[in-house]
Amino acid sequence: MKAKIPRNPYRQGFSLIEIVTALAVVALLAGVTVPLMTRETEEARIDRAKVEVEALGKAMNLFFSTVGSYPSMDATGATKSLWVLYSGPTIPTSNPWKASTQFWTWMSNGAGDLLDNHLFRNAPGGQSVNRYVTTGPSSWQGPYLDPSRLDPWERPYVVNIVSGWSSSTTKYRRLWVLSAGPDGKIQTSANSGLGDPVGGDDIGFLVLQR
């Protein structure tokens, strides 16, 4: 014979007030937790971008140490012809940033190339005929990095490579590797003079200052 557990005749379930209170607590916790998680995720992206711009910058300097110049050869074999280099596997067909920028002007005018065509493979402009020399004391000895990727916000890292070969005394004095950062807008001057810092929430690594 099973014993019967007495039921509290006064306890028929949760009251409406209790349910509303519980839902309010859950909503409050969600309101606190979601922004915290979002902030932590954004901080992780920023940290990743800092690591990657530094890695790209060090690869640029390693290239310089073996070739004797920064990568600026175009598909015809002419040096000091590129103004911008950008990461990722393909050439963008439209402005990947949220605002107009000199970097995109250079890219769309044909004065740019993929970083990988210089640092990962010896194929300026994506071709294999006109290349950096591979023998002698000043030669291409890569790859200098693994295939580059987009930044944590799915936009290219960019390098104002013109600063690596220009002789201007007023412009192009700082060579940067840049991410546009969380807001997607490059606010660092592409024509960087000596006093021009990283702008906005851009994330940058200074490769060279001359």
Model-identified regions with their sequence ranges:
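N-terminal single-pass transmembrane signal-anchor helix
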Residues: 10-41, 45, 52, 57
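Short, surface-exposed interaction loops/tails
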Residues: 2, 46, 143, 150-210
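N-terminal secretory signal peptides that target proteins for export/translocation
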Residues: 1-9
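Short, glycine/small-hydrophobic-rich surface segments
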Residues: 60-144
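Short capping/connector residues at structural and topological boundaries
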Residues: 75, 149-150
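Soluble non-cytosolic domains of exported or imported proteins
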Residues: 47-50, 139
